Amino acid sequence: MQEIIEAVDRKLLEQELTPDKFVKRTNSGNNEIYIVTCHNSPNITREIGRLREITFRDAGGGTGLACDLDEFDLDKDTPFQQLFVWDPREKEIIGGYRFIHGKTLKRHKDGHIDTPTSELFHLSDTFIEDYLPHTIELGRSFVQPNYQPTVNLRRGMFALDNIWNG
């Protein structure tokens, strides 16, 4: 098992929190929701990967790598987008999930769609053609340990609700 990477400098994270990535304020807690990719926010993406690995290891899982980022997060053409909740007071990422619109998924010459779901299930041609373009694949959702109710009730009270606001 690899040692988890160091936290990304908060100043670097804040520099990437630009208005074009801002979605909205949360309904509870006055936190902020953003959407980024590895291309427009490499530091935030790295911190998300670090926090996911910490969170999943804490729950008995994890990749065992230094940072939980894979080919879907880092794709050069159409990476998954990262929706996350930012706590502006503590300057921390609370949690989030990655997603991709089904219509942006590319079909290989052999008909295979490259997505985490296709690694778990056989996607029929009918599903790929008629339904997939109207879907959004969500995955790797997490609430980092410092915002889970079992660790900090005050912080954790609305953490998951804040993510669902997105």
Task: Give the label of every model feature segment.
Residues T104-G166:
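Acyl-donor binding region in acyl/amide transferases
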Residues Q2-H39:
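Conserved N-terminal entry element of GNAT/NAT acetyltransferase domains
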Residues E3, A7, C38-G49, M157-D161:
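Generic detection of long, well-ordered alpha-helical segments
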Residues D73-F84, R107:
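A short helix-loop-beta-strand connector motif used in the catalytic cores of GNAT acetyltransferases and
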Residues F99-K103:
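Acetyl-CoA-dependent GNAT
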Residues T78-Q81, R89, I93-I94, Y131-P133, ...:
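Short, well-ordered loop/turn elements at secondary-structure boundaries
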Residues R25-E71, Q82-R98:
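Short amphipathic alpha-helix that is part of the acyltransferase structural core
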Residues E16-V23, L69, F121-E129:
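Intrinsically disordered, low-complexity boundary segments flanking structured domains
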